[in-house]
């Protein structure tokens, strides 16, 4: 299961971090060295004697080393990387998939060292490196974690002693940006210090890593407790843990917070790793985890304040997983904005409430709560698909600014810097 892989990965990462060698670990072939199954496939190219196959009516059964894989013949023809089928400069397919005979079979198959050659009925030859087939097979993907993460509760995060990144280093050096993104990808939160306490500098910081996602709240939002928008965030009240924009079909990926001024008490920010809590549910009540990943819910935002009139609806389960490896990639949890439950029959509703209660209990455990006092100059980035946030009530005048970032662009920046994202 995905959490077993993450637990193993987390242990390896923590050992690397203790030795001050995390950057080395992150560079190793996109984290492959951190996974036991990736190690299994290393240096197998020379072991061609361990490669055998059997041709079935509609697919090839291939055993390479100790792994059995199955490839549909249409798939093998469609994924040909020859010059006439695939443009290696643009990394785009040239072959018209609809032109491939759905009953196609190779005339011959031969192995030359670590490469399989397929000759098709029309004479076209497709070649595949065995390691490429392993990496891209369904059986191989079932063992892969899409994004390595370190799951945490408050103590685990504090014990990691992750350093913040300085504003100038973040803006001016690849090393500073990469260090920030390493922390963010692994833990779902990251801080930048010594930022001038203005909206303009906060925007400059955000644009270093991503395009800013414009929403119904604008590009950069700036708010106090004046209830200028129809949202509890625009008050002095405490906010329970939640993820933002659950009422969007695609919730915003990253959230940026900068407290520009606070003349009063309270107002600490609450952070909870939703994936850590979900892991506890999966371990203790796997059937409830499954239910939370299967039942679609509506979340809704209705606003009629001043000139702001909006009615947003987003639909999706609380826990979102990749179907091929059951890896969790998004948690959509906001009890404020959850709409009427009318997407499942009555006999599922009670079981859903029980599962929701189990997850909520985990999210509310005091040991899972990380409390942070935001202050001018300290900017917080939150993975809104993973980490829930909230706040305690406060007194006095408090100004915050921030924005949402497009998740694709943050991950794109990370990949360009050589990180696994």
From Swiss-Prot:
GO biological process: carnitine biosynthetic process
Domain of life assignment: Eukaryota
One Pfam match: GBBH-like_N
GO molecular function, one term: oxidoreductase activity, acting on single donors with incorporation of molecular oxygen, incorporation of two atoms of oxygen
Free-text cofactor note: Binds 1 Fe(2+) ion per subunit.
Main localization category: mitochondrion
Quaternary structure note: Homodimer.
Sequence similarity: Belongs to the gamma-BBH/TMLD family.
PANTHER family, A to Z: GAMMA-BUTYROBETAINE HYDROXYLASE-RELATED (PTHR10696), TRIMETHYLLYSINE DIOXYGENASE, MITOCHONDRIAL (PTHR10696:SF51)
The protein's name: Trimethyllysine dioxygenase, mitochondrial
Source organism phylogeny: Eukaryota, Metazoa, Chordata, Craniata, Vertebrata
Gene: Tmlhe
């Amino acid at each position: 299961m995905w959490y077993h892989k993450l637990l193993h990965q987390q242990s390896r990462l923590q050992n690397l971090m203790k030795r001050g060698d995390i950057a080395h670990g992150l560079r190793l072939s996109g984290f492959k060295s951190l996974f036991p199954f990736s190690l299994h496939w290393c240096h197998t190219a020379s072991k061609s004697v361990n490669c055998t196959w059997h041709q079935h009516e509609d697919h090839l059964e291939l055993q390479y080393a100790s792994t059995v894989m199955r490839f549909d013949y249409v798939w093998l023809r469609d994924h040909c990387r020859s010059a006439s089928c695939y443009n290696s400069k643009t990394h785009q397919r040239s072959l018209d998939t609809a032109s491939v005979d759905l009953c196609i079979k190779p005339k011959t198959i031969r192995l030359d060292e670590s490469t399989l050659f397929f000759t098709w009925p029309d004479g076209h030859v497709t070649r595949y490196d065995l390691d490429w087939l392993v990496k891209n097979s369904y059986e191989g993907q079932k063992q892969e974690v899409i994004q390595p993460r370190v799951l945490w509760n408050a103590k685990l995060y504090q014990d990691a002693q992750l350093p913040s990144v300085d504003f100038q280093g973040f803006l001016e050096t690849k090393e500073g940006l990469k260090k920030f993104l390493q922390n963010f990808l692994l833990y779902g939160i990251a801080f930048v210090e010594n930022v001038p306490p203005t909206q303009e500098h906060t925007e400059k910081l955000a644009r270093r890593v991503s395009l800013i996602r414009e929403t119904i709240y604008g590009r950069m939002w700036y708010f106090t407790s004046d209830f200028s928008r129809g949202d509890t965030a625009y008050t002095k009240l405490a906010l329970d843990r939640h993820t933002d924009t659950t009422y969007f079909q695609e919730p915003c990926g990253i959230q940026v917070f900068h407290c520009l001024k606070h003349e009063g008490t309270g107002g600490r920010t609450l952070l909870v790793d939703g994936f850590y809590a979900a892991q506890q549910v999966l371990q203790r009540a796997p059937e409830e985890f499954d239910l939370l990943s299967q039942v679609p819910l509506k979340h809704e935002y209705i606003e009629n304040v001043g000139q702001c009139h909006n009615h947003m609806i987003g639909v999706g389960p609380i826990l979102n997983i990749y179907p091929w490896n059951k890896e969790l990639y998004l948690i959509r949890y906001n009890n404020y904005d959850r709409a009427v439950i009318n997407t499942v029959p009555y006999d599922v509703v009670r079981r859903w409430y029980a599962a929701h209660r189990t997850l909520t209990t985990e999210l509310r455990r005091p040991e899972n709560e990380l409390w942070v006092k935001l202050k001018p100059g300290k900017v917080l980035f939150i993975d809104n698909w993973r980490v829930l946030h909230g706040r305690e009530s406060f007194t006095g005048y408090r100004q915050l600014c921030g924005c949402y970032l497009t998740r694709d662009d943050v991950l794109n920046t990370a990949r360009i810097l050589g990180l696994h994202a």
